[in-house]
Amino acid sequence: MNRRNFLKTATLLSVGTPLFAKNDSRLYIELPKKPFEYYEKKGKQKGGRVLIIGGIHGNEIGAYKAANMLVDTDLKKGEMLIIPRSNFTSILADVRGYNGDMNRKFESISKNDPDYHYVELLKEAILSYKPDVVISMHDGFGFAIENKRAWGQSVVIDELKYKNFELYKEAKFVQENANKYLKRKLAIINTKTFTGTIHKEQKKALTGWCLKHDVKAFCIEASKQLPSIHDKIHTHLVMLREFFKMYDIELEGGIDYLIDNIDKLNILKKPKITLEINGKKEILTYSKLLKVPSKSAIKVVSIEGQRGDFVVPHGVNLNWRSFHFNNLRFHIKNDYKTLYHIDIKRV
């Protein structure tokens, strides 16, 4: 699949819907497709080509929020493809993997797996974009510099060197320079994915898959135990700054602007939700109880707000796009955070 077809496929992505009897007297709702977000940036000056992936693990907030901040920037130099929410279902659920660990599905995945289309789209993005490097962003447990079993605050490599990729050399550059600006210091973790026996599972992960397909890749980890989301985002942006130096990437205004304005650039606003209930529109911007007659058909027509906004039914399979129900609460979320809710009751 070429890049044009990849982008087309991403917009046509569909998700499963359960089957119900036609004479069901309950309410019926149809939700929008979950977006597979991708943003391509190109500077006027030639530089490197970098692919940024966030959100493979849905409860790693600092990672996907930092990736998301890059979307609003323009490039002065180089090229970049940003996929900030690669596992949006898990982000909305605020769990590592709603359908299992997506970062163990790159070696092989069943077509029946709800993550299948997203994993395949990520693979196609990598192969069609042909980046100089892929950076997979995560928030890991603990502090690797203090605990050999921890992953937080680290640059993760699969080998010291893989083919002609000097992974340790580049990781060392990032570690040494980023540590000048971080209170909690970074370690380098070498999983020895292809030569060792401890982390064989990494062959199934994104970076291992990339290397096997001759694409250089690193994983960068902030710590889940940092005191705030601000600190996690800060850690990621400081690490990215060093990668950008190596790969000749320059942002208009500089990445330091993002680092200095993390809170200002992450202010949430309540989105406007437009429903269609039996053909009649209902616009909502705050919590409300809606009473509707039996057999009513409800459709979420639009969600107008920020990236990461979505309508999330409470206690319902998040892979479903449409279903029947009697009484249900719908959380209006930005990523993991509920901004308000809509209660719909059958009368």
Predicted regions and their residues:
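Structured catalytic-domain cores with a bias toward divalent-metal coordination
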Residues: 3, 7-8, 22-347
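Hydrophobic h-region of N-terminal signal peptides that target proteins for export
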Residues: 13-20
